Amino acid sequence: EDGSKLVDADGMHMLAIFVGTIVALITQPLPTASVSIIGLAVAMITKTMPLEGSPAPALAGFANSTVWLIVAAFFISEGFVVTGLGKRIALWFVTKLGRSSLGLAHGMAATDLVLAPATPSNTARAGGVIFPIVKSLSLLAGSTTETEESRRTLGAYLMMSLVLVNTVTSAMFITAMAGNPVAVDAAKALNTPVDISWGKWALAAAVPGIVSLLLVPWLLFKLYPPTR
């Protein structure tokens, strides 16, 4: 049987709009926001996504409280970067905990934990705030990427710790990673009796998350120790 007959006309139209939007997002003829708005407009103009109903299918995403939670978190995270507050927090933890290599790793972990609830991009959090601090600390210790011996001085340990800790903090809050709200919506679609709120997610992840943040740098220190 022809597979196309299993999809109605609106479904095929939506597929065409979706593919076109994805191609535009990849090739970037316009900024991401403009491409997204144009894609939505085309879907509404062609009536692929109607404006009738409550909420209207074309605008249903704007009625999702989780979406607005993520939007607010993006605004706050931009403030961390622009004002330099994120770096100030990182440096404060370094001054308090940075008496050893393990202390530096725990300081970076604490920074990630503080920033995670308001930074829905784990890449931006790690690469935009914490990585520059780790790089500076590594260079101060004479650790560069030129040789394996130099990397093992301090930089390799801190970078490995940064990556592993970032994975932990990304799972601790709904707003710590863009994929988490998708998981919440998927759970709702299954009609489960549990309503996963921001607080419930954070409470459920608190104990395993904090234990992991304490153990990961320590275990890495034992398995992949810096030479300084």
Where are these regions (language model features)?
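Short, amphipathic, aromatic/basic-enriched membrane-interface segments that mark the entry/exit
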Residues: 1-10, 93-102, 147-153
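Membrane-embedded alpha-helical segments and adjacent helix-loop junctions characteristic
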Residues: 34-147
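Hydrophobic transmembrane alpha-helices of multi-pass small-molecule transporters
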Residues: 1-69, 189-193, 200-228
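Helix-loop interface residues and adjacent transmembrane-helix termini in multi-pass membrane transporters
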Residues: 26-29, 82, 99, 195
